[in-house]
């Protein structure tokens, strides 16, 4: 999925990225249940292509909704269903990808080619981004960090702040920059302006911050209207460079007297591979907290340590036994 996403941008075409989740999940699941039968794997992939991608309308205003929270799970569910169906003897639909009239690329990609942006190795898994500190869409994570750092300078000067400027990369502008009316929490956690306004005012962002019932909601709504988002071409360039993969944002304040605040720049948000050492203790803390409904902290800590000690060649049952027995 990651390698396909690096080579083919579905969101630029108006489709949701979970289509590649479906393709990848279906391929792997078909391999598992068929003991590597190439005919069944191919049939699964082609049946998924026949399904086509879903629109990403539910990720953008004014149609943002909770579907974006279950879209990936839905894609995996459908992938498993298609894999099971593809065990049955059926056509392989071998022309689905390239057919010049009714083929997938012709219909959905306007004859552009779907391709891998990276070889199928461990690069993607080694570069996974962990959402550690803030419940915010990842293109805005470093902006939230920068805003939290700038909060101490902003708060005593909020009444004389004329403008808040965010310098960001092009994908962030395309995907999460939204100053229009935000209809619900799903809208707000995909608004760069909203999350930055929250971080400046409160020095933090939590899931409660996105609710209309949140105590600071009205002030956040007023402040986000002062925010200007501009592209920093360097940030866009380094976003796409494989050896960097920055997700950079800068924030500064323009005051009414013409002066400016310090510009705060965060190039790699916490959870990025470049900041793994900082992230691991926080990931553990998040794991313990999020499993507290099921396990006592001591038990959860034992599970964490056992998972960390797993080796790549360990039997899968060992992982299951850890979850059962701790």
Residue positions per predicted region:
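Glycine-rich, mobile lid/loop segments that gate access to catalytic sites or pores
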Residues: 1-77, 81, 96, 100-101
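Terminal-appendage/accessory-domain detector
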Residues: 63-77, 84-326
